[in-house]
Design a protein with these regions (language model features):
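Conserved active-site-adjacent core of cysteine acyl-enzyme catalytic domains
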Residues: 5, 9, 13-16, 20-23, ...
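Active-site-adjacent structural segments surrounding the nucleophilic cysteine of cysteine proteases
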Residues: 1-117, 173
Length: 223
């Protein structure tokens, strides 16, 4: 069964990539989505990640929709996918649902599992099924080229992609990890050779949160 599922997924990937290859995409796409940080407020992303602010002691924890400081702390470093989903919901459905509220609902629906203090990574198949309740249709691709991403955006879609967390500081941070962090791709510019992301754990200054423009060649190293 697992082999069949994998072959089916690979066929789905191939079919989509062929569509993307044969299609023409615009020179530039720039989608204005709301920005949602996976931490309490955008200014607290950097100190939280640099361990100078303990999420359980964050005075703004309620901003995420968490039910308690403890639940915010449990989710803070795992909420990138839910923050990206909240941005998509804000754009497509004009819904303002907090990321921690989405996270707890997703947990109940099997998108995540929790064992003690450990919360798993997002389960993509379960995510695609779960997000339908909010009126979104998600397609899961295990491999997607940059042209495939551009094809999706040129059709008015958004793409949540898995990248290295180090992409927020790509000019200084090593590309020694691929995947592990979810961001929302909101645009590209073929003339300048760049791709733009909304990064739920980006920093305020210099900006790596909202429409963070990255050279495609660099993006590929972290994608």
């Amino acid at each position: 069964m697992k082999i069949f599922s994998r072959l089916l997924q690979e066929a789905k990937n191939l079919f989509y990539e062929l569509q993307a290859m044969l299609s023409s995409v615009g020179a530039r796409v720039d989608i204005d989505t709301p920005y949602v940080c996976q931490f309490s407020i955008p200014e607290h992303a950097e100190p939280s990640l640099k361990k100078t602010l303990d999420p359980s002691a964050d005075p703004h924890w309620k901003e995420t929709g968490a039910s308690s400081p403890e639940r915010y702390a449990a989710w803070a470093f795992t909420m990138c996918g839910m923050a990206s989903t909240a941005m998509a919901l804000g754009y497509f459905k004009d819904k303002n649902i907090k990321p921690a509220e989405l996270a707890e609902d997703a947990l109940r629906s099997g998108v995540y599992s929790e064992d003690g203090s450990e919360i798993s990574s997002m389960k993509y198949k379960e995510f695609a099924n779960w997000v339908r309740k909010y009126g979104l249709v998600a397609n899961v691709y295990s491999k997607l080229s940059v042209k495939g991403i551009q094809h999706a955006l040129s059709q008015g879609k958004l793409a949540i992609v898995s990248v290295s967390p180090n992409i927020r500081g790509y000019d200084t941070a090593p590309a020694d990890q691929r995947g592990g962090h979810l961001v929302l791709v909101v645009g590209y510019d073929r003339d300048t050779g760049t791709i733009s992301i909304n990064n739920p754990s980006g920093f305020v200054n210099p900006n790596s949160q909202i429409k963070h423009s990255i050279p495609v060649a660099t993006f590929k190293k972290y994608y």
